[in-house]
From Swiss-Prot:
Protein name according to UniProt: Ceramide glucosyltransferase
Function: Catalyzes the final step in the biosynthesis of the membrane lipid glucosylceramide (GluCer), the transfer of glucose to ceramide. Glucosylceramides play important roles in growth, differentiation and pathogenicity. Plays an important role in conidiation and virulence.
Family membership: Belongs to the glycosyltransferase 2 family.
Pathway: Lipid metabolism; sphingolipid metabolism
Gene: gcsA
GO biological process: glucosylceramide biosynthetic process
Segments crossing the lipid bilayer: 91-111, 441-461, 485-505, 537-557
Species whose genome carries this gene: Emericella nidulans (strain FGSC A4 / ATCC 38163 / CBS 112.46 / NRRL 194 / M139)
UniProt-annotated catalytic positions: 383
Reactions catalysed, as given in the entry: an N-acylsphing-4-enine + UDP-alpha-D-glucose = a beta-D-glucosyl-(1<->1')-N-acylsphing-4-enine + UDP + H(+)
Cross-referenced InterPro entries: Ceramide_glucosylTrfase, Nucleotide-diphossugar_trans
Amino acid sequence: MFVLSTARCTETRANKPTNHRRAEPDLTTSPRLLSSLLFSSLLSPLSTPRTRPSYNANAPSPSRTPMITLQSITDAVGLGSARYGGFQWSVALGWIGLVWYSTVTTVCALGYYKLWKHCLRRPQSSYCATAQNAPHVTVIRPVKGLEPHLYDCLASSFRQEYPRGKLTVCLCVSSRSDPAYATLEKLVADFPHVDARIYVEEEDPLLQPDHKPMYNLGPNPKIRNMSRAYREAKGDIVWIADCNVWVGKGVCGRMVDKLCGLGSGSSTEYKFVHHLPVAVDVTGVIGVDERRALETSGAARVKDGKSACAPGVLAMGGGRLEELFLSSSHAKMYTAINTVLIAPCIVGKSNMFRRSHLDYLTTTASCQFNPGIDYFSDNICEDHLIGDLLWKNRVREEKEDGKHLGKHALVFGDLAFQPIANMSVQSYIARRVRWLRVRKFIVMLATLVEPGTESILCSLYGAWGVTTVLAEYFQNKILSTWTTFFTFFGFSILTWCLIDWTVYIMLHSGKTVERDENTPSFARPPQGTTRRRFSHWLAAWLGREILAFPIWFWAIWGGMTVTWRDRQFRIGLDTKAHEIGGNSRAGLLEEQASGRENENEATSLITTAVKRQTRGNR
């Protein structure tokens, strides 16, 4: 790794002192020197030394009195010392690392401030909750199999404080053989005053084999479930929320207020509004009947990989990792980016927009699909693409009427709670890999730099910057030591950890939730000071931070296939999803055939669990 030059050898006189030799550098105490020598070994073949070594035939043999000296990169490639106007790679990289560290910590600080400002108090009541002229809202809930607390999550849409007659709930499922179908029927029966309907993909007229011309919808199973509900939606405003999301009873009104610029807040209208997702691991909390139903239906199995074969940390620890990820690093970055609004940042758990806007932007002569969400049926990451399309393009009101519309808005204070149970570590990894592989062709730059926003790598960048840039600027040898490097790194990790702990406490405090007798346990304030003990939380935090880079590396360089909703897809460079193993219709028929064996038993268990859970809530 070092550039060696043999100096001209001279005989040492016996009467001359020999204690004036040049001291060799200590590589163990200087990160900057080690980096210089490292780059020297890499770049020296590409450059010409300043002087060529000369050999004197009359000189004594080198074996008699050799003197070996080390040259840094600046001497080797002729760039000179930075102190004298030259250039050093270590300092250049140090500047990059220091600027990056400062930028990331500033963004995290902004996100932390916004969470502290909005997540420790209950949001105000919405204007639309009592307004007779409130716009009509169509709620679309795509359902796939059983999820923990499925009844509670879906029922939260029926319990919204919104003018009666101005809210329609659409429950979408692929087939009547889906284990969740009994739950959907019970919901419709339990809320007869709500305009609600169950949409079955198998019964969609456009998707029937005898339909002329045949409507060749893309392979995205979520879009296929929602397609008919979207086409037949009442009114202009559409609210799409995943089936495993629970929201408070005043959320719909506040979303409409933000979208339409109503109420006491800002009068700016937006094209797209959404919520911050928060996961809660409810493993061990759900009832026995519900757990048996989940296991029978297969929802407790790992959805994105092989099933966990034994209970324990690996079999059940994925839920804690997911809970921690959405309640720490993700929450800070998501909130900060949606505060400065430099780019679209969306997670498709709970989104609201206007049909007229999306239809206008997706009506093209070359598209083979209907306008609206069907336009994205060839893609997996449809939620991000919908938001991205509304962000980058002007709608009719902006073009023709000159109306000013905001791009996106996060409804601060309201959270989209997602209960999860029996998630293995392998399932968590597969989930993160799937998300990264889908995103890497959609937002490539953001995906490539994502590891640098995590605590470990970002702290390494900062430590490198301090021990190179600041050491060079202040001419302080102490700052350039490995002791300073690891001291800064350790202090940064400790500070990062404590900040994430307080973020977790704020998000799980339950102070933003409008509680009543129907509020489930996972959305209520914890019985103790915090939802998890610090030691348990710290173990999950360390596990997630350590896994962050390996997961990213495998997702980016380990392939282009993902598994979603029990189907395998290959993500192309055009960001489209290509189903592996046949077309979507064949995959659907195969899925239906494999699920009919346990249909009767699962339906019976589900019905029993739902009835007991409903009686318990009441």
